[in-house]
Amino acid sequence: MIETLLQSPSSWTNFFIFFGLAVLLLFAVLGFVTYGILAERKVMGFMQGRIGPNQVGGRFGLLQTVADVLKLLLKEDSIPKAADKPLFILAPVIAFAPAFMVLAVIPFTDKFQFADIGVGLLYYIAVSGITTIGVVTGGWASNNKYSLLGGMRAAAQMISYEIPLVMSVIGIVLLAGSLNLNEIVAAQEKVWYIFVQPIGFVVFLIAAVAELNRTPFDLPEAESELVSGYHTEYSGFRWAFFMLSEYVYFFGMASLITVLFLGGWNPVMFLGFIPGAVWFALKFSSVVFLLIWFRVTFPRIRGDQLMEFGWKVLLPIALANIFLTALIKELFF
């Protein structure tokens, strides 16, 4: 359907169809993220020997996150007097919009994808970097030293870990011969790239956690050092924009890992009778669980350790993986 609409002449009908699909995707993602946050809180509670949310919406706390969202929407919208008002208002939108834009190219099954473009992987990496501009803008516009430090940390962290993140997937591009995410999944029909590219997977996973600003790389919003980091002065629905963008990226990155390294919707061996959507959901859930496990387990590292690890460890390993992959492809494929 999407391909037909893209190839048809421009018209107001097509515009409203695309607009309706975009709004539908927005609400679907927001609903998923709402309960994804609840799932994370329950898993963290289990790992820490707690029950987690258990009051609002029954014993499982099914409406806890919904109540939290309503609370944020009803809070007073305050803007500091000394803040740069236009940029302060614009920053959450700049951080929020790209988070949804990247989901357009993720193939969840062979038939369920919003837009199948030839350079889906390049598009994801390029668009995801825009969020950092929103974070830095919010930190600077707040006219608060803690916010500014958080924004500067976010920029330094993104620059340091975007490079090994990109380098780690070059091995996959060499093997698949394409930047199209559907073709990368198709190339894993016999063997998943996590087994062919174990070094690339480890580098990508670590760099992805750093890009998401999650523990142990959550320096831009380190509560014990910077109050709340770049969104210290934000409250209500503007703060919710930053939070939602963080979690949409979290689930988007888990989807990308599933596509690049775990074969997407490809089944395991003789279990092909199980629908591809189920396989994607299982692999995606495993990656999400692993990332939550990281958050609960590891302590935050220091800023100098973060920079050294990115430039002196991950980047050389990612470069070595490219040469190793090229050599293997030349000799055996």
Curated annotation (Swiss-Prot):
Catalysed reactions, as listed in the record: a quinone + NADH + 5 H(+)(in) = a quinol + NAD(+) + 4 H(+)(out)
TM region(s), chain numbering: 15-35, 88-108, 117-137, 159-179, 191-211, 239-259, 274-296, 313-333
GO molecular function: NADH dehydrogenase activity; oxidoreductase activity, acting on NAD(P)H, quinone or similar compound as acceptor; quinone binding
Keyword flag Transmembrane: yes
Enzyme Commission identifier(s): 7.1.1.-
Source taxon at top rank: Bacteria
NAD recorded as keyword: yes
Places the protein is found: Cell membrane
Cellular component GO terms, alphabetical: plasma membrane
Enzyme type, top EC level: translocase
Keywords, sorted A to Z: Cell membrane, Membrane, NAD, Quinone, Translocase, Transmembrane, Transmembrane helix, Ubiquinone
GO biological process: aerobic respiration
Family: Belongs to the complex I subunit 1 family.
Function noted in UniProt: NDH-1 shuttles electrons from NADH, via FMN and iron-sulfur (Fe-S) centers, to quinones in the respiratory chain. The immediate electron acceptor for the enzyme in this species is believed to be ubiquinone. Couples the redox reaction to proton translocation (for every two electrons transferred, four hydrogen ions are translocated across the cytoplasmic membrane), and thus conserves the redox energy in a proton gradient. This subunit may bind ubiquinone.
Subunit text: NDH-1 is composed of 14 different subunits. Subunits NuoA, H, J, K, L, M, N constitute the membrane sector of the complex.
Protein name: NADH-quinone oxidoreductase subunit H
Organism: Bacillus cereus (strain B4264)
